[in-house]
Amino acid sequence: VARLRARNERLVEENDRLHELASAYKAQSGLHSIAGFYRGIEARVIGFPPENESRAVTIDKGSLAGVRADEGVLAVGGVVGRVVAVGPLSSTVVLVTDYTSRIPAVVRRGRWWGIARGNLTSVVVDYIEQDAPLQVGDVVVTGEGRSFHSGLPIGTVIQIERGNATLSQTVVLRPSIDLGALDRVVVVPK
């Protein structure tokens, strides 16, 4: 019985490792697909800011690899942010949750436009027309802009704020990817 129990534990551990490898492979192949489709530059995240600093990361590709300022950055699942500074070997990417981030945004279901801005932990979309019948769960994607192609997932609506005195409404999004767990990204030229 003890040997069977030990063997079972080893098989469970091996199964867990295989699931992790399968997930990593799936993510990597998805990243290759994004890079190929947009002729993007694959990069690794090599630096995160200290707590309570700006919401930016450092990637391991710079001007020598073809990265330029204002290019969009994606990961499997959606928008990461935008390149704001480029060195020869690395670049700084401001995340969509940073206060300085502004992206043209569209609610996919009804094509209602707004501006997505960072709010440190989430993304807020302002200036959506007041009578748009928004719903929690609506997906918001990029509109046509300087840094991004249109139709890329930004996040999902988790809260709707309808202003009485304004002609627009605001929604709060949960970003489409876990920005705290970034590893590999693709810089996408526009």
Regions found by a protein language model. Name each.
Residues 2-6, 10-190:
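A secondary-structure micro-motif
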